[in-house]
């Protein structure tokens, strides 16, 4: 699959800002550490001033290695024969830096691929050109950043405004991505097409002689529903219609979260499932390869669908990396579970296959991820007869088209990760509890919905501390006909973690058995799948930055309905 570089453009940042007419409408995250530190440590409240932004230009002292103008706007793309499809997409222009730092996926609604090296300084001038009612902000999923650069929904800007990101990349080599993160609107905006990849390289990775260039293939898995006119359907409405230009026809309640009667409640509870699998923005995707080794860098970019990845040949998958890093050494799995927001890095060796051979990457059947109301209701939100969550599906085809010789060998050692020891956690004997449950028809964390500017005392951690968190996906007796819950991919902003243990309630072990061997818990992660009745312990160190960060379910309809909380890192 060809990836095209976006070559340097003579347009300057000044031209970009003048052209938008936003010289006075520019917003950049201001330093808010002083505001946070002014909160008394004895106080029982950690209410944070709302939307602490200042209308000003970029920091003149910040000299970027890479500068990018990034616009979110409606456009049309060809997806199926016939009428073009209305989407919302990120478009980028390189203002400064290596031309190879910005690439496109041709004829796709997906945003650019940004490639950087660890230690580089990046400026992104993000402009919101979405329809009225669509506030937005960009979250750099997986990057460790200061709070005002992370994409917290409290910094969301309205249409016609610009937000300037300025940060140094401190991450290890890994596959990250970026997507919208406004409160109550993330699901719709991401579904409409707003997503891109952010790939970090470092000196350690460069020594490993992994496949690069045309042999390093990004794979973005999504599911979508199209109507007879090739238009995207989301919660019963077309993307781009007047109804959908303001929260998809949903009204916004006092909580700031979208609702639309029973339809809105069911969508937030079950999540949206699409009818067709899209790969890199296209259905019916075929990857043409040679008889050699490839590196497949796979993102689950779906709103709510979970995949159980496996080769049709029965060969095991060879994994070299996950969310936040390469692994310490390669590992093999017969299948890999990949929940929304998770990434996996695959060493794919086609050297023993003959030209003309075809194999496919499939999602195998699994059970137990939906246990609400005694039946699988996720398809209710699909705008049609979408495959149920856990259904077997073909994701994409791989066709061996030519012979090619190469000498790459799978390294026995990959990354030297700074792994933590569980006993070094300040709360090793009493992990911080994170309870996932159903409250009415809304999923909540520790019994609380999202509050934009609040972190409770029990949601406050100390900078440079090591902690254990224990996520419990509990049963919900008395809720929705004794609902036993759903799988929740939990994402933490601002930190990487290690998964140190898993266990499940005996009454839900049958479903868990269909997924447990596909967890890749080695390495550093930022998103973890938690099955109904499952208890997962995480280990992490809160370093580099203080401030307010979110943690939430990455089933985007759950997030939009309030399954998100803040945590505060305090110096």
Go through the PLM ranges and name each one:
Residues 83-86, 136, 140-142, 148-153, ...:
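Active-site pocket scaffolds in enzymes
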Residues 336-338, 342-367:
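Repeat-solenoid scaffold signature
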Residues 1-15, 22, 30-34:
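N-terminal secretory signal peptides
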Residues 176-181, 357-365, 549-553:
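Short, aromatic- and glycine-rich surface loops/edge beta-strands on solvent-exposed regions
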